[in-house]
Amino acid sequence: LMCNLLEGVVNSGTGVRLRYKYKLTNPMGGKTGTTQQHADGWFIGVTPDLVGGVWVGAEDRSIHFQNLANGQGANMALPIWAKFLQKAYADSGLKMSGRPFDRPAGISKRLDCDETISEAEAKEMNKSLREDEEEFY
């Protein structure tokens, strides 16, 4: 379930730049982060073969980026992760598979919304999902 949540960050959230700007198409997830007063930006990335993180900031807490746009993890740390991941996938010696995340046994998909919404409302909500997209809860 956690991998599914983190994939959402990369497929349609603050990490989507990995897909369109850096052309990374393999299964992956991530989480961006920014600290108070734009002092740190970070990105944690996960693939089925690799987990890593990038932190951009300073140990001296009085040093910080001038504005949120510069201090965001999606703007400062994510590009570093993207370049690293591009090189990792290009290196055949690392054997990065590009396989999907493993789905643990015992996880099932249940679409049981009738206690909170009508069947017509559920069908209308499902129209917004791409045909190949599934959400797990």
Report residues per predicted region.
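Extended acidic low-complexity intrinsically disordered regions
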Residues: M125-Y137
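A penicillin-recognizing enzyme superfamily signal
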Residues: L1-K127
